[in-house]
């Protein structure tokens, strides 16, 4: 079944709202990418509106971590997800989203990119 992002047919009172127009393709959505930690890297290219392309990162084990103290950015391995404010169940499934705290070889880092839409995991090293 398709994900539809249009307005509901019901008001908060329960009354039915009659549509002025039918459903359009532009109102469709897609399921979230939910980027997970895995041994292999898996990307999915999706056509967007206006014939543009969006790269969805589905599986990865690396992140570009920026160290603010030394002004250095390194590609390091990600071991696990420590905290994720988006959903508490993402922690045990090792799902990375923007704002997630991840454990890397350099230490704890906070994800600053949107892996499901950018196709890459960028993070900032957290100071202890």
Swiss-Prot record:
Keyword set for this entry?
Ribonucleoprotein, Ribosomal protein
Q: Tell me the InterPro entries matching this sequence.
A: Ribosomal_eS8, Ribosomal_eS8_CS, Ribosomal_protein_eS8_arc, Ribosomal_Se8/biogenesis_NSA2
User: Can you quote a single GO CC term?
Assistant: ribonucleoprotein complex
**Highest taxon in the source lineage:** Archaea
Q: Which GO terms describe its biological process?
A: translation
Query: Record's CDD domains?
Result: Ribosomal_S8e
Q: Listed GO molecular functions?
A: structural constituent of ribosome
Describe the subunit structure. Part of the 30S ribosomal subunit.
HAMAP family the record matches: Ribosomal_eS8 (MF_00029)
Family recorded in the similarity comment: Belongs to the eukaryotic ribosomal protein eS8 family.
Protein name (Swiss-Prot/TrEMBL):
Small ribosomal subunit protein eS8
